[in-house]
Amino acid sequence: MKHATAIAQLEIHASNCENNAVIQEAEGQYEDAANNRTNAADYRLAIEALQAE
C-alpha cells in the first residue's frame, strides 16, 4: 500500500490523542481534551486522504 508508513504513524498519533482526551476530560482539562479530539480528527482526515491516493 502506498503511504503505509505515514498512515501507520498517523494512526498512532490519532489513537494517542483520543486516549489523552479521555484522560484530560476526567481530570477536568476540557480545553486540552477538545484540542486533542480536534487533532485526532485531523489525523483521521489525513489518513483518509492518503488511503484515497
What annotation goes with each model-predicted range?
Residues A8-E53:
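Short, charge-rich amphipathic interface segments used for partner binding and complex assembly
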